[in-house]
Amino acid sequence: MKEFFLGIIQGLTEFLPVSSSGHLALFSKIISFPSDLALFAFFHIATFFAVFILLFNDIWNILYGLVRSDKNMWNLALKIIISSIPAGIVGLFFESKVEAAFSSQKLIGVFFLVTAAALWLSDKYSGNKTLNDITYLDALIVGLFQAIAVLPGISRSGFTLIGALLIGMTRVDAFKYSFLLSLPITLAAGLLELKNVDLTTATLSGFAGAFISGLVALILVRFVTISAHLKYFSIYLLIPAIVSFFMK
């Protein structure tokens, strides 16, 4: 039952710009469930499939374009790879430091506030760049925002959306790029930890919960991104931030 509950939390908070890692660390402590990074990473595979379904047409266009040697699609695929590199480097070389951050609930509270402040400002920015218009430097900048989000309490979706909006992307394409960018890192994280997860009925129920709630969250975040209402999530984030400061 606890695994299913945590799967629901993972699916919702993975895509809503409120930090899934921070919420999982917080709720694990509240329900006295050991912080299991392998299990949380396994749930990433479920959220991978949620993105795959919602953005299937875009993913198909990229894959079909690669087969047909479409220059725009090859460039876009390369930009996604470039954006994925910074977070990959942080994950490989600073894993122990990131894991240590999960043990400090007050530090997680600070990171919640950082995400809240960034989201409050994000609705002021957007531009006219489409997926095909962004440069390799733009892709690297968004990737740096994603790398920061390996810290618990910093939202990956929130920070990549902010990065995409700051480089001047349209809100629709900022949403698409943010979640296309999530595919390599979420799948890799899930597969790397799969060997450390016991595939019991409980863990599979958590997987199902993450998938279903992930789809719901994706639809919601697409709406709030396009309508420039991300700031409302910054108000919500004050709650887990305050709770984190009072947790022992």
Curated annotation (Swiss-Prot):
Gene Ontology cellular-component annotations: plasma membrane
Zinc-finger keyword on record: no
EC number assigned by the record: 3.6.1.27
Membrane topology recorded in Swiss-Prot or TrEMBL: Multi-pass membrane protein
Catalytic reaction(s) noted: di-trans,octa-cis-undecaprenyl diphosphate + H2O = di-trans,octa-cis-undecaprenyl phosphate + phosphate + H(+)
UniProtKB keywords: Antibiotic resistance, Cell inner membrane, Cell membrane, Cell shape, Cell wall biogenesis/degradation, Hydrolase, Membrane, Peptidoglycan synthesis, Transmembrane, Transmembrane helix
Residue ranges of the TM segments: 4-24, 37-57, 74-94, 101-121, 134-154, 174-194, 201-221, 223-243
Main location: membrane
Major enzyme class: hydrolase
GO terms (BP aspect): cell wall organization; peptidoglycan biosynthetic process; regulation of cell shape; response to antibiotic
Keyword Cell inner membrane: yes
Location(s), subcellular: Cell inner membrane
GO molecular function annotations of the record: undecaprenyl-diphosphatase activity
The protein's role, per its UniProt record: Catalyzes the dephosphorylation of undecaprenyl diphosphate (UPP). Confers resistance to bacitracin.
Note: Bacitracin is thought to be involved in the inhibition of peptidoglycan synthesis by sequestering undecaprenyl diphosphate, thereby reducing the pool of lipid carrier available.
Family: Belongs to the UppP family.
PANTHER family listed in its UniProt record: UNDECAPRENYL-DIPHOSPHATASE
Name of protein: Undecaprenyl-diphosphatase
